[in-house]
């Protein structure tokens, strides 16, 4: 699989699915699976039976991984989804938003 150009801590926009249009920060990137975990997006509920550690039981809510193709980096200028290009500035490789030309990092 090619390099995803999405890193932990990036602000991203969800492009499709039940959370389309929502923005969040990338909490985890799983390049081998081609998935990302975005804070506050793609929440699922897991029902837990009562146990010794958790005698009450209950429902745990947490973010599930989603396919990396469903998210795009948010443009630093206007917050809309954009593609990312890698350019060399001052001898260092930096990620640049294609829409605005703004540097995403570095």
UniProtKB/Swiss-Prot annotation:
Keyword terms of this UniProt record: Ribonucleoprotein, Ribosomal protein, RNA-binding, rRNA-binding
Any single biological process term in GO: translation
InterPro entries: KOW, Rib_uL2_dom2, Ribosomal_uL24, Ribosomal_uL24_CS, Ribosomal_uL24_KOW, Translation_prot_SH3-like_sf
GO CC annotations on file: ribonucleoprotein complex; ribosome
SMART domains: KOW
PANTHER family: MITOCHONDRIAL RIBOSOMAL PROTEIN L24 (PTHR12903)
Function noted in UniProt: One of two assembly initiator proteins, it binds directly to the 5'-end of the 23S rRNA, where it nucleates assembly of the 50S subunit.
Record protein name field: Large ribosomal subunit protein uL24
Organism annotation: Erythrobacter litoralis (strain HTCC2594)
Record gene name: rplX
């Amino acid at each position: 699989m090619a390099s995803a150009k999405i890193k932990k801590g990036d602000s991203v926009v969800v492009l499709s699915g039940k959370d389309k249009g929502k923005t969040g920060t990338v909490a985890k990137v799983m390049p081998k699976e081609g998935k990302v975990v975005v804070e506050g997006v793609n929440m699922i509920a897991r029902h837990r039976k009562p146990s010794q550690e958790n005698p009450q039981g209950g429902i745990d809510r947490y973010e599930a991984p989603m396919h990396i193709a469903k998210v795009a980096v948010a443009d630093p200028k206007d917050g809309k989804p954009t593609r990312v290009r890698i350019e060399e500035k001052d001898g260092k490789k930096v990620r640049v938003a294609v829409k605005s030309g703004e540097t995403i990092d570095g």
